[in-house]
Amino acid sequence: MTVRVNLPKSGMGIEEGTLARWLKAEGEHVEKGEVIVEVETAKAIQEVTAPATGKLTKILVAAGETALVNTQIAVIEED
């Protein structure tokens, strides 16, 4: 099953974030709850965790790019 990884809301008034650093690469195995990317907002650095266990099949927003809250940033194919 394909699982979307969306940029979560990090606080009141925060509508976007810049993907600072991917901790996992495409094709790597991820565990549910594992931190996969760090996102920089106007207020802090936020860690985004994998919503499912499986393979990170596609990164849709590269490090250094900005995305709106709830935008899909990656795809995980569940084991």
Kindly give the residue locations of the regions a language model identified.
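Mobile cofactor-carrier "swinging-arm" domains
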Residues: 1-79
